From Swiss-Prot:
Residues 243-433 form the GATase cobBQ-type domain. PROSITE patterns: GATASE_COBBQ. Its EC number is 6.3.5.11. It comes from Sulfurisphaera tokodaii (strain DSM 16993 / JCM 10545 / NBRC 100140 / 7). Belongs to the CobB/CbiA family. The active site is at 324 (nucleophile). It is an enzyme of class 6 (ligase). The record marks 425 as: Increases nucleophilicity of active site Cys. The a and c carboxylates of cobyrinate are activated for nucleophilic attack via formation of a phosphorylated intermediate by ATP. CbiA catalyzes first the amidation of the c-carboxylate, and then that of the a-carboxylate. GO terms for biological process: cobalamin biosynthetic process. CDD domains: GATase1_CobB. Catalyzes the ATP-dependent amidation of the two carboxylate groups at positions a and c of cobyrinate, using either L-glutamine or ammonia as the nitrogen source. This is Cobyrinate a,c-diamide synthase.
Length: 437
């Protein structure tokens, strides 16, 4: 399959990849059908892509999905689109190891790389940075864009240092081009009200000083992709679709777009808001993902109808999956300035803000649950600042971490009835329980 595409990478985080990738999508979308992708497990950056290109951005994560899973997703979501823009994660060679890096994603998908290099407080040294990144593993670097250029003289110094790849242009320094961050990364597009203005401003800067035609030319040089099997097997299709009730509001909005699409094969999707005290009749599945419940504790404590509904459905045996922020909501209480009472399906007390826990997980399934069977090994990702600080004697765990921290003493996957709650986030291309049984 022919699918023109590029990866936007850098030497480090905080280089401007997200806003430049998103603004480039916006510029290209004026004359092409653009699909955004995000290397790695991030939930926030794809929101910027989605706003920019006006289609959902798709995660490509070698740890969570495996090589074949990544290829399937790239092909599945590239069909019908003129170009794909894949934003890398951290620096080019970073990850749990280089085999799970943006570089490796470029290799397995045969995708050319365009570097974004933050040139603040540096000029000619940029040449050494680019050469080092290219030569370290003979990376498919085909171009470079300079970010935070202070003047034409600054640009010329940087440009003259580059010998081996094309300089595609620059983004001038402007403090209004930045997006603020908080404890889990950039502000989400829902919470940062200036997102659209920033996108428009950076898009204009790209149009003025970046060679868009060259970028398209590089994307067109990407090798063809070999077709692979469908994302879901016939055995996993269910013609009698039940309802999957998915929590979605400012407190709970960390979901992989592909997870929701995969659930559509088996369920009719309906969304509800705990913040608005909503519920959905007769669900076959309730899914409460991550997000920022710690910013909405008062409203969540008052969501009495949603709380009663979730407890009733749990006691009936309805499948319930709660990840990270969802785990917090299903706990006994969240402690911040005071104790806020939650659903209390699990006798767990959660401290709202502690040290940042971030990284991949690998878990042995100790007992059957809605995501896996005993003896299986699941991979996930944890990303939170909260912490379990008290645990009742009756809390049971269905998973044990080989890698990662989990909820308590390297155990994760708290289980009661047919409900599973974890600090790990999962990708359903590999954790297929909700699709298979």
């Amino acid at each position: 399959m022919r699918f023109p595409r590029i990866i936007i990478s850098s030497d480090r985080s905080n280089s401007g990849k997200t806003i430049i990738s998103s603004a480039l999508m916006r510029v290209l979308s004026r004359k092409m059908k653009v699909r955004g992708f995000k290397a790695g497990p991030d939930f926030i950056d794809p929101k910027y892509h989605t706003l920019a290109a006006r289609v959902p951005s798709i995660n490509l994560d070698l740890w969570l999905m495996g090589i074949e899973g990544v290829k399937k997703s790239l092909i599945r979501y590239g069909k019908g689109y003129d170009i794909g823009i894949i934003e890398g994660v951290m620096g080019l060679y970073d990850g749990i190891n280089v085999n799970y890096s943006t570089y490796e994603l470029s290799e397995v998908t045969k995708t050319p790389i365009i570097l974004v290099v933050n040139c603040s407080n540096v000029s000619s040294t940029v040449g050494a940075i680019v050469k080092g990144l290219k030569d370290y593993r003979n990376a498919r670097i085909r171009g470079v864009i300079f970010n935070q250029i202070g003047s034409e003289t600054h640009y010329n110094y940087c440009k003259s240092s580059i010998k081996e790849v094309q300089v595609l242009g620059y983004i001038k320094y402007d403090r209004n081009f930045s997006v603020p961050s908080r404890h889990l990364g950039l502000f989400t597009t829902e919470d940062f009200k200036e997102t659209e203005n920033v996108l428009q401003s950076v898009s204009k800067a790209i149009e003025e000083s970046v060679d868009i035609d060259k970028i398209i030319e590089i994307a067109n040089s990407a090798e063809e992709l070999q077709e692979v099997d469908e994302a879901i097997s016939n055995d996993e299709l269910d013609t009698k679709k039940g309802i999957a009730a998915i929590a979605y509001d400012s407190a709970f909005n960390f979901y992989y777009s592909e997870n929701i699409d995969l659930l559509r094969y088996k369920y009719q999707i309906e969304f509800f808001s705990p913040l608005l005290n909503e519920k959905i009749d007769n669900p076959s599945l309730i899914y409460v993902g991550g997000g920022y419940p710690e910013l909405h504790l008062n409203e969540l404590e008052k969501s009495s109808s949603t709380i009663r509904w979730i407890k009733k459905e749990a006691e009936k045996g309805t499948k319930i999956l709660a990840e990270c922020g969802g785990l917090m909501y299903l706990s006994k209480e969240i402690i911040a300035d005071k104790s806020y009472k939650m659903v209390n399906l699990f006798d767990i007390s959660i401290k709202a803000k502690d040290k940042l826990t971030i990284g991949y997980t690998e878990l042995d399934v100790l007992s059957d649950n809605i995501l896996g069977r005993k003896g299986e090994v699941l991979r996930g990702h944890e990303f939170h600042v909260s912490k379990a600080i008290n645990l009742g004697n009756d809390v049971k765990f269905s998973m044990k971490n080989r890698i990662g921290k989990g909820i308590w003493e390297n155990k994760d996957g708290a289980i009661v009835y047919n409900t599973l709650a974890s600090y790990s986030h999962f990708h359903f291309s590999s954790a297929r329980g909700l699709l298979s049984f």
